[in-house]
Amino acid sequence: EDGDVIRILEDGNAGSPRYEYVYDESSKSFKPKDEGQKMVVGTKYFALKAVNANYNFITVNEGKSIVELDLETGASDERGLPAIPLISDVFTADASGTVATMHHLCGVVEVPVNLSVEQAARKVTYFSIYSSDGKLAGKYTATPYPPYFLGTSTPSNTAYSEEKTTPYEAGDITVFIPVLPGTCTGVFLNVYFDGGAGGTYIDKDRQLVVERGKITKVTQVNY
């Protein structure tokens, strides 16, 4: 909307200068707040949505974004990163400051589910997948609602789907769960319903491989 603000952090540190781009409805684009607020042409930035609903952009450090380095090391929010969307992009600023050369931070697991009438009656609203070896969601935990924030909290081996406002109906449904890239085993599907939760193995002996920017589809789960 007109007047919406995009904030840009140069190096990801909380104390870094913050530049601002303001959305201009007439031109349908974000424009620098002033001449001193322009992104550097050719520089890579990382897009993340902050808690306050504005957008921050973090520069890439030697080929990897600050956020990606944090995911590898398990660092917390020392750089002022209150939340990281699982599905996000790295882009290079061009002359107009628009988005180019994107790639995804995570992959997505597609889980076909045949939900029984009995279970649907329990008002199922969201799902998660759990990995016995703890590699499924990296060192961060995701919230079960869009845009799938990665919170900087304790290590987690669980990743969540979107939480629906109305329960799933019985029958064949498809659940999409964003997951950090990697390989995991003993993958368990948790089903969350009104007042409790249940679960079933997707495939106890199967290795689940999640690739950046790709959808991994597993076999149907009957629940």
Locate the predicted segments by residue.
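A short, solvent-exposed beta-strand micro-motif common in secreted/extracellular proteins
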Residues: 41-56, 129, 183-195
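Short helix-loop boundary/capping segments
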Residues: 88, 92-95, 109-170
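Beta-strand secondary-structure signal
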Residues: 46, 108-112, 126-128, 176, ...
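Ser/Thr/Pro-rich, low-complexity mucin-like regions
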Residues: 113-124, 179-211
